[in-house]
Amino acid sequence: MEKEKNKKTSSLNVLSIAGLQPYQKKIDEEYMNKDQILHFYKILETWKTQLQDEINHTLLYIQDNATNFPDPIDRATQEEEFSLDLRNRDRSRKLIKKIEITLKKIKEKDFGYCNSCSVEIGIRRLEARPTADLCIDCKTLAEIREKQMTG
């Protein structure tokens, strides 16, 4: 499979693809002002477009390379490769839904605040994970609880 297709999408990669630098907060700047909202809107839209392109590329790749190999081992290898591609496609599709939810939060002026405690999530955390809906403290607590539940 092509190397380009196997690249992992990261928020830093999305920043560079969007042609953006990390946001430089100004002194006494209000949290989630117009500039910050625009910054994250561009990041999310670019990320969504990139994921949609990858999904389309996966479908085209599978359609173009679907061959009925006479050798069962070759056929099994191809099926496993396609299975991995489809699993990645499904993961991307779920991430697109999270991005769309986050874009909706931006439109509703509810972006950047923790769903649990309503505190500011923070610019750097949102740049690292633009779809974050919990502040670092609430996320840490949730992970500790999850770890305790699973043992």
From Swiss-Prot:
It holds the Pfam family zf-dskA_traR. The keyword Cytoplasm applies. SUPFAM superfamilies: DnaK suppressor protein DksA, alpha-hairpin domain, Glucocorticoid receptor-like (DNA-binding domain). Transmembrane segments: none annotated. Its main location: cytoplasm. One of its GO terms (cellular component) is cytoplasm. A zinc finger (dksA C4-type) spans 114-138. GO terms for biological process: regulation of gene expression. Gene3D superfamilies: DksA, coiled-coil domain. Zn(2+) binds at C114, C117, C135, C138. It comes from the Bacteria. Belongs to the DksA family. Interacts directly with the RNA polymerase. This is RNA polymerase-binding transcription factor DksA. It comes from Buchnera aphidicola subsp. Acyrthosiphon pisum (strain APS).
